[in-house]
Amino acid sequence: MESIGIFFGSDTGNTENVAKLIHKYIGTNISSIHDIANTNKKDIELFNILIFGVSTWYYGELQCDWDDFLPTLKKINFNNKIIALFGCGDQEDYSEYFCDGIGILYNVIRLSKNVRFIGSWTSKGYSFECSKALDKNKNFLGLVIDEDRQPEQSNQRIIQWTKKIKTELNSLLN
């Protein structure tokens, strides 16, 4: 399998911790992990398979490092790349903006031709009002983690999601 680049932005450490677990479960021999705060366009362009992790802040805003990186992200050509997304949010205190960061990244990346997204995730088991991270079938566009309200479910969700994206990758690449 090709090398996978995992890029995250984190203020509190939650998204970074999730990224580290994804790195572990995907396989440290086939993936590398990068803080978006220390990333440039060329770093991302090195990979054909990318996993982006973002948290949502305040009223549906991107984590600050992703917000700073957004102009660069818009310049990247994601043609023929495979993308998986994950995000952290608080479904109780920010129920009307739950994990919007995933949707914001998705809406930038999807503009490239032939980009393929993998790793959609069920919205069952979460309680929120609204999210830009939902697809037309009401599934999340990627893995959603709530370390504030459901920390006991995070590890199992990460394990299940990494198995899912490995299966999807094997199907696409073989």
From Swiss-Prot:
Belongs to the flavodoxin family. Keywords: Electron transport, Flavoprotein, FMN, Transport. It comes from Buchnera aphidicola subsp. Baizongia pistaciae (strain Bp). Low-potential electron donor to a number of redox enzymes. This is Flavodoxin. Gene3D superfamilies: 3.40.50.360. GO terms for molecular function: electron transfer activity; FMN binding. Its cofactor is FMN. Signal peptide: none annotated. It holds the Pfam family Flavodoxin_1. The keyword Transport applies. InterPro entries: Flavodoxin, Flavodoxin/NO_synth, Flavodoxin_CS, Flavodoxin_lc, Flavoprotein-like_sf. Residues 4-166 form the Flavodoxin-like domain. The lineage of its organism: Bacteria, Pseudomonadati, Pseudomonadota, Gammaproteobacteria, Enterobacterales. Transmembrane segments: none annotated.
